[in-house]
């Protein structure tokens, strides 16, 4: 191996390491952005939900995280648009959940 080959290998390796460092930094920034967004959503939910409604939403999050996220987004939109005049009670949250829940299919099996 000549000096030219070694320097070329070093340059490629250095470029590869710099690329990896840049990727790690971008990934870390994305994680931090998601954490900030999550904390902002939690702050809004604390302002618009009563404790029992918040507890119900947390329970739903354990079983259906996607559905809970959709409900949270809906609540944040309502809060930001100014449509919420008071905190949402557990009964009001139940009504909202019924409206947002996908329609269940009812199957009936008849035997001959």
UniProtKB/Swiss-Prot annotation:
Pfam families: dsDNA_bind. InterPro entries: DNA_bind_arc, PDCD5-like, PDCD5-like_sf. GO terms for molecular function: DNA binding. The keyword DNA-binding applies. One of its GO terms (cellular component) is cytosol. Coiled coil: none annotated. Keywords: DNA-binding. Belongs to the PDCD5 family. This is DNA-binding protein Mboo_1886. It comes from Methanoregula boonei (strain DSM 21154 / JCM 14090 / 6A8).
């Amino acid at each position: 191996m000549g000096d030219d080959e070694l320097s070329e290998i070093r340059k490629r390796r250095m470029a590869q390491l710099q690329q990896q460092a840049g990727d790690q930094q971008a990934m870390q920034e994305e994680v931090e952005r998601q954490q900030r967004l999550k904390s902002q959503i939690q702050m809004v939910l604390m302002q618009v939900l009563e404790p029992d409604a918040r507890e119900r939403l947390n329970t739903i999050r354990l079983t259906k995280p996607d559905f809970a996220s959709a409900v949270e987004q809906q609540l944040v939109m309502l809060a930001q648009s100014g449509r919420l005049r008071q905190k949402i009670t557990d009964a009001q949250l139940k009504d909202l959940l019924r409206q947002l829940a996908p329609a269940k299919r009812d199957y009936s099996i008849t035997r001959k």
